[in-house]
Amino acid sequence: LINVIISKEEGTIKMERYEEIEKSIITTYRKKIWSKFIKGIKEFEMVQEGDKIAVCISGGKDSMLLAKCMQELKKHRQVNFDLVFLVMDPGYNPINRQKIINNAKLLNIPITMFESNIFEVVEKIDDHPCYVCARMRRGYLYSKAKELGCNKIALGHHFDDVIETILMGMLYSGKVETMMPKLHSQNFEGMELIRPLYLVK
């Protein structure tokens, strides 16, 4: 998805100046990315006056794109809201951890990083480790975001992820399930999850 803006070479982002990338999101890629991003924000009412949103960054291209889109949204905002860029280290090796830090710096994304022991815990689980990992990650992100005064977390899932989730459910469990563009947390009162790239293909 973000490959249209950023190319990777030996694990490090090779790129133009971040100002040019920011400009390209709303010009060169206006139709492909920006317009669909804005449509999703408005159609599903994802951002309201006074929100403090934790943009959750895994280090991958989708979450990095989300971070840049949210920065641009704030810059061109019609409502007042605040952003925090949250990176959870579930047990990365030092090289991968540093890559995330370096790439965020190159993209001018001021990250807040915190640690968890998810990888260590999941290594000991035999049944459905991916499911357990995803649930634990979500819980840690909600908890840290709430600690920082946020009322929402934003994840980088896009349209392709939505379709994949539907197909996986149909093929493996015989159920039609999908990702919602936003949902209220059942375990963290007052917290909401949003997926601003929901309509971006």
Task: Give short role names for the model-derived ranges.
Residues 14-168, 172-180:
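ATP-dependent adenylation/nucleotidyltransferase module used to activate substrates
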Residues 1-14:
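Short, positively charged and aromatic/hydrophobic N-terminal segments
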Residues 178-201:
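Short, flexible loop segments at boundaries between secondary-structure elements
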